[in-house]
Amino acid sequence: MEVRMDTRFWGPSGWRLLHLVAFAAPTLNKRYLLQFFQNLPYVLPCKFCRASLTEYYASDPIPTDTKEFANWLYRIHNRVNGKLREQKLITGKDPTWHNVKQRYEKWMKQSCTQQAMIGWDFLYSVAYTTPCSDVTSTPIPGAPLHPATPELKNRWNTMTIAERLPKLKLWWESLPHILPFPVWKKAWLKAVPHVPKLACGRKAVTEWLYHAEKAMCQELEENAPHDSFDGLCNELNTFSSGCSKIKTTKVKTCRAKKTLKRKSLDRNRTRKYFATGGFL
C-alpha cells in the first residue's frame, strides 16, 4: 500500500519553507531554483496534492523572472486554500499579499542567530513516502487508461517507481542550493555530503534525513527536533494517511484519522514547536 502523509502534519512546515525560498529567489542559483520547483509536484507526500499542484502549474506556470516567484507562490497557495475551503476543511480568508510580503520580508532580514532551520516535517514526509519496489500506485478515480505525459501521469497518480525516483533525485539534489539563508546552505553542504539512496526505500531515505538533521542542527548549534530515529518513525507512522485506499472522487486531501496516540504526539509536538521558535 502507498504511504501518504496527513497534510496537517507537513503542510504548514512546507509552506513556510517554500515561501522563504520564493522570497529569496532573486539571490539563489536559478538552475537549482527551477529544478526544485519543477520537480515539486512529483514529490509531494499526498497524491491529491500532487494532482492539484500539477493542475495549478498548468494554469499558472513557474515564472521565468525570479523576482516574480514570491507573488506566484502566493497565488498558488491561495489556490490550495480555495480547494480546502470547497471541501470545508478550512474557513478563513486568504491573507492579503501586503501582509504576506511584510511577514516574509521581515523574516528574511533576521540575523543568523534567529534563523533556526525549518521545514523538517515537510522534508521527513517526502522522505517517508519514497516509493518502494513492492508498492504500486493507486490511480485517482477517473484516470485515463494511458496518460501520455509525465504531467498527466502525475495528475492521475499512474507514474511508475522508475519514472518517479529520478524526479525525487533531482529535487533532493537541488534542496541545499535553494535554502533561503546562506548559513543553512553552508551547513547542509558541509554536514550532508550526498543525496539519499532512493532505490533503498523509504526507511533508508528517512534514516538518511534523520542523520542529516542531526548533523545540520549540530552545525547550526541548535537543538534537533527529534531525540531518536525510533521516535521519529513512530511520529511519522502516526501521521501517515490512508488516502491511497480511497476510491471516491469526493475526498481530495490526505488526512489521517484522529487517535489518542496522535493527540498525545500533538501535545508533545506543540511543546517542541514553541521550544524551536514556532517552526518545525
Model-predicted segments: where are they?
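Mid-to-C-terminal functional-domain signal that highlights helix-capping/loop sites
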Residues: 1-43, 47-280
